């Protein structure tokens, strides 16, 4: 059985953990790999390496940092389909959705390449009697990112390129359900010339999350996931005075007025609700057609929803892939059971 590695010293390295999480292919249900629960000893060793790496990286000229990020951008473009395939295989997202999410992440890398301009400070003269004001932007130190299962490339790429561009070292903890994409991105960063241990990847579940939150050597944490976990992260990080950016789960509602274009409204809802199998933070979970448009809207929605081609993620004919796990599927089915009226059930099968 394939064992997923951690990433430090610019390469994938096996964990010494004896505890593992099983990984299953969402399309086939086949068990294909085991993810280690990184131990405290491993974590502390990696943090020690990152502290040394960060102090050197912070003194690297910003033009050099920008150059490495640009090379990383080029490597992503060269390996675009390969990375998208990894996303599809481990998450279940259809290939077109995988490529779209990767492109969104790549746009952030492109933005981070402009770091020489983004890090400029400010100077104000005579803000008070004989007082001038200067402000400068300096690295925080070691930053960490805890990312969700639904966007294995895009969300990590929101986080580490900008953090690293600013002179920080970055520890990435991907979802234990989708670890392989993060490892590939770290490998490409190393290939682009990033020094050892400026970017590391550690695997696990709540065990490694708690180590990150409690570590006094980590200065900031970015998180995307559920609202309860976001609240937990804010609470725990406050104990060690970390800066925190935690994006909790969101719910979108769609209101369809009587004068709306019926075709556009239904197409918009189909994309918003069923894109990426609905596994998006901003997926539309509630739609309210108003007045006389309700029946024609629901009839057209039923017609179009029943035609969505559900299949394996890499099947070119598939328009919607599977949910991430069988447990998640059961959760969604439980919502259907609580509903007042089921219009179509083809996709649920």
Which residues fall in each region the model found?
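Conserved C-terminal structural/oligomerization subdomain of aldehyde/semialdehyde dehydrogenase
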Residues: 26-34, 194, 218, 255, ...
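Rossmann-like NAD(P) dinucleotide-binding subdomain of oxidoreductase/dehydrogenase enzymes
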Residues: 121-264
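ALDH superfamily catalytic-core signature
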Residues: 228-345
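Structural signal for hydrophobic packing residues in well-ordered secondary-structure cores
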Residues: 54, 58, 73-80, 84, ...
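Hydrophobic heptad-repeat coiled-coil signature
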Residues: 171, 346-349
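N-terminal Rossmann-like NAD(P)+-binding subdomain of aldehyde/semialdehyde dehydrogenases
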Residues: 1-131, 324
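Hydrophobic face of alpha-helices
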Residues: 47, 66-69, 73, 84, ...
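Residue-level signal for inorganic ion chemistry
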Residues: 29, 65, 87, 167, ...
């Amino acid at each position: 059985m394939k064992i997923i590695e951690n990433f430090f010293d610019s390469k994938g390295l096996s964990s010494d953990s004896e505890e593992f999480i099983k990984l299953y292919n969402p399309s086939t249900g086949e068990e294909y790999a085991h993810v280690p629960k990184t131990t405290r000893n491993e974590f502390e060793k990696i943090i020690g390496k990152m502290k040394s790496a960060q102090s050197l990286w912070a003194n690297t000229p910003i033009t050099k940092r920008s150059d490495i990020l640009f090379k990383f951008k080029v490597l992503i473009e060269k390996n675009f389909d390969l990375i998208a395939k990894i996303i599809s295989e481990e998450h279940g997202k259809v290939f077109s959705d995988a490529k779209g999410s990767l492109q969104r992440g790549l746009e952030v890398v492109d933005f981070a390449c402009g770091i020489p301009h983004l890090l400029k400070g400010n100077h104000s003269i005579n803000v008070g009697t004989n007082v001038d004001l200067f402000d400068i932007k300096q690295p925080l130190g070691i930053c960490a990112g805890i990312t969700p299962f639904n966007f294995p490339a895009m969300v990590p790429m929101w986080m580490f390129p900008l953090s690293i561009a600013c002179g920080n070292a970055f520890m990435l903890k991907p979802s234990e359900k989708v670890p392989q994409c993060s490892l590939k991105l770290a490998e490409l960063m190393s290939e682009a010339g990033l020094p050892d241990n400026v970017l590391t990847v550690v695997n696990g579940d709540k065990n490694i999350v708690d180590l990150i939150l409690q570590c006094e050597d980590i200065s900031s944490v970015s998180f995307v996931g559920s609202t309860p976990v976001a609240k937990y992260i804010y609470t725990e990080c406050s104990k060690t005075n970390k800066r925190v950016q935690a994006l909790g789960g969101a719910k979108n509602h769609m209101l369809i007025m009587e004068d709306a274009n019926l075709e556009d409204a239904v197409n918009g809802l189909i994309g918003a609700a069923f894109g990426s199998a609905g596994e998006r933070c901003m997926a539309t979970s509630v739609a309210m057609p108003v007045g006389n448009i309700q029946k024609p809207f629901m009839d057209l929605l039923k017609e179009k929803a029943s035609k969505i081609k559900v299949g394996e993620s890499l099947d070119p004919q598939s328009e919607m892939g599977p949910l991430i796990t069988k447990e998640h599927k059961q959760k969604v089915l439980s919502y259907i059971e609580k509903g007042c009226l089921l219009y179509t059930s083809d996709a649920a099968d």
